[in-house]
Amino acid sequence: MNNSELKTLIKKQKTNYSLDQEFYVSQHIFDLDVKNIFSKQWVFVGHISRIPNYGDYFLFNIGKESIIIIRDKDNAVHAHYNVCRHRGSQICLENEGNSKVLICPYHAWTYNIDGSLKGARLMDKDFNKNDWHLHKCNSKIFEGLIFINLSDHPNDFEEFIAPTKKFIEFHGLADAKIAHRQYYPTDGNWK
């Protein structure tokens, strides 16, 4: 599907009707969604109850990016790109788990939960570990809900959350727990 076909598809969309099938299955439309929505806006990725303990983590994959959401020993939540700074390998290969350090399976570079480089084998003596931390992903927690933003210059979170703030606060989600999760594989995108 090209942009001209997409414009035609949008023009023929009827108000108050469900979207045409292409909006759910087209790779081109999904790529545009990632570029224009998910790469620029705050995105809800999960609830803090999903990572209750020190070292608990889960991955959130968005487009071609994989983000590690992990809790440290002070209960702070960090979001890092799941990419080793050495050779670009993915660090966490499991979708969720617990780890007190993040170890790249390729050359065993080791990172602290805060993203700082803890160890890198066989590097020159003038190698500065402080220059090789994991890339952080913008993140905020509001009422127990974890949000990330992939943009280098994210829009203001307070402005983003303002229209729904009172509704979210009313439900006391900071104290909520996930009772059960179920995965349903589908041949479609996020819509």
Regions found by a protein language model. Give the residues of each.
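Short cysteine-rich clusters marking metal-coordination/redox-active sites
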Residues: 84, 104
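Short cysteine/histidine-rich zinc-coordinating motifs and their immediately flanking basic loops
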Residues: 94-99, 115-119
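Cys/His-rich metal-chelating microdomains
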Residues: 87-90, 110
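Aspartate-rich (DDxxD/NDxxD/DxxxD) Mg2+/diphosphate-binding motifs
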Residues: 81, 89-94
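Residues immediately within or flanking Cys/His clusters that coordinate Zn2+
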Residues: 57, 78-81, 101
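Residue-level signal for short segments within beta-strands and strand-turn junctions
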Residues: 71, 81-83
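Rieske [2Fe-2S] iron-sulfur-binding subdomain
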Residues: 1-76, 110-191
